[in-house]
Amino acid sequence: MTKNILLRLFISVLLGFNVTQTISAQDENHGHSAAALQLIKGQRQWFDTQNAAGMVYDQTPNYSLLQFNYDQKSGNFHRVYTAEKQQQANVYTEGNLNLGKVLAWGEFRFTHENERDARFNASLNDPYRGQPFFVVDSGQPSKWRHQNYHLRFRVATPVVFQRLTFGIQATYKAQLAAKQRDPRVDARFYQLQLQPGLTYALTAHDVIGASLNYVSQKEQSDMSLENMQRRLHYYELYGLGTAHKGIGIGRQTNYYGNRWGTALQYEHHTDRWKILGELFADKLVENVDISFTTPRKDAQIAERNLGFKVANSIYSKAYIHQINASFNYKSTNGITYLSQRDNTASSAGWIELHHDIRSTYKTTDATLNYVLTRLRDSEYSWQGAIGIDYQGLDDTYLLPVSFKKSKNAMLFADYRNNFIVGKTMNQRLLLDVRLMMKRAFSGKYDYRGANNDLITVREMEPLDEAFLTTDAQGARLSLTYSQLLRQQTNVNGYVKLAFSELHSKAKTFNSRRNVSVTLGVNF
């Protein structure tokens, strides 16, 4: 039995083919249009929590999709480590199966990305992942190549013993990156995440849940020079522009850490109303060692997260009203180590002399949005949304005191209209228009150390702060055409074209454009 379940899930996720069929959320013989699939995904409240055991309460119908996407971004309105030009091609497949004794969902994504005119980062696959201790170069424009693999699945039981459900979510990521200009970098990031959980039905309308969160991650960064005749400078970052300047081949850096956390959920539902709340907390400890042969502990981060999510849906025959909110507070201590080399024959290596907290990083993220959906059969006729995403950064280097602060909000208004082009082949044209406005409320970078001449202080950090404190406005337009590939089947093919631009009037920046083309099928 287990073998058959795994085989069917594998087929669904990797090949995008749904082995079993469901009619409850489909127009008979028409499958899912693009709008219908969006509507299905938009109603999965438990899916957006850390608890896979709640899958049964989402009542998601079976579906599968397979799509290919090409995405291109260009323009100088971006954060300091982001490349000015990015080209990305990816293949993505996703499937949901209700097999009676088990509910299963999975996704797989492979992404190949080329970057041009990327500056400073000379160490990490993703310099924005929350790790402040890494290496940068002198800011010369460079090319990067990325290959990313992402696999995630959820498996859960239906209700057992009249009240209980059990589930687990697992995620595996492998990200490979290579910098194409001296000093060159080969960076490899791996992450495994496990999230077991359970739910308990208190009454016919109330459900509580609890889940655990464990993450093991590792990144290896290996610098090298192809032109040994030219010795280039590099900078080992220790927070807010504070850096140690080096010259030559660079260094090998080993990052490894674990995250532990837990989450609690509560749901109340009736025929016309459903609200789900989640409270979560976790802690990450990640070590930074230099060299693989004779490791020297250089730094460590201790990160704590505390947050909540609330999803509220009100249903009627014609409309769905949704109000969603989230909040996350992240506090990170940056710890540096002082070590001494021990060259004795018995214990060659490094001796730790002292370590202390030298920098702190605090991030506050909050979101609030409202979505109104006008229903039409198993899809929607139109959908409107408004929302705001807020982020506050408060970073401090303790001695000598330096700081970097900013408060930003992105406001948006979204409208989608699902036009019926034809009925025999389920032809649909989905129009999606979004207006965006970025507002910076405050921000400042103030370095008070002794090395004002370093490029990390003169240019790198001020450029990043300039982006964070710059206002902008923009728009996004996308068109998705979908139809049945053959009559009397439920296989819909679709093509999506999307364009967006974010424009700033600041002297330092101009704009950022994004063009995307997607081809896919769903069942």
Question: At which residue positions do the language-model features occur?
Answer:
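Transmembrane beta-strands of outer-membrane beta-barrel pores
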Residues: 68-74, 110-114, 159, 172-176, ...
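Residues that define the transmembrane beta-barrel architecture of outer-membrane proteins
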Residues: 85-91, 145-151, 186-192, 256-262, ...
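Outer-envelope beta-barrel architecture signal
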Residues: 60-64, 100-106, 162-166, 204-208, ...
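Outer-membrane beta-barrel translocator domains and adjoining extracellular loop/strand segments
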Residues: 76-82, 117-123, 177-185, 221-227, ...
